[in-house]
Amino acid sequence: MSKKFIQFIDGPNLNMLGEREPEIYGSMTLDEVHKTVKKYVAQNYKEIDVNFFQSNSEGDIVDCIHKSKNTASGLIINGGGFSHTSVAILDALLTIEIPKIEIHLSNLFRREDFRHHSYISKGVHGVICGFGPNSYCLLYTSPSPRDISGSRMPSSA
């Protein structure tokens, strides 16, 4: 039996975790978050493998989403600042029909008003935010892909 493959995408400035605003994002680096997720998945989900991609470039993120269409069983995205600005990432998410979850370390609704809206939320099945690095592992308590694969995505219009 082949393993399911989950693609994680981390957007701009997430490579600065541990240095950038630790009072908001915590002290763990992105590499430490990824190692924690890999360990958690290996211990609890033998049938799942994970891959991580981080970019500060919108186009690179769009390309990674497109590639995930044919390679991944699911996609987890922390769009960072692009969550609040990127129609291009939303459109890319709407082109793939695998289960998708948006995650954020901070609670967007306790932050500045401009962070309260995420364009990319329309292109995913669910959103997890506000649990710091634990947001990356909480998604494994969400419904399985078979539970959400039949749900309809809203129109981008």
Predicted regions, residues:
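Extreme N-terminal starter segment of soluble prokaryotic enzymes
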Residues: S2-F5
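N-terminal nucleotide-binding beta1-loop-alpha1 segment
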Residues: F8-N15
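Glycine- and acidic-residue-enriched helix-capping/strand-helix junction motifs
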Residues: L17-E32
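Short beta->alpha junction loops
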Residues: N51-G59
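Short acidic active-site motifs
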Residues: D60-C64
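Short acidic/histidine-rich motifs immediately flanking catalytic phosphotransfer sites
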Residues: S68-G74
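Flexible, gly/pro- and Lys/Arg-enriched active-site loops
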Residues: G79-F82, V87-L138
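Single conserved hydrophobic/aromatic residue that forms the stacking wall/gate
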Residues: Y140-A157
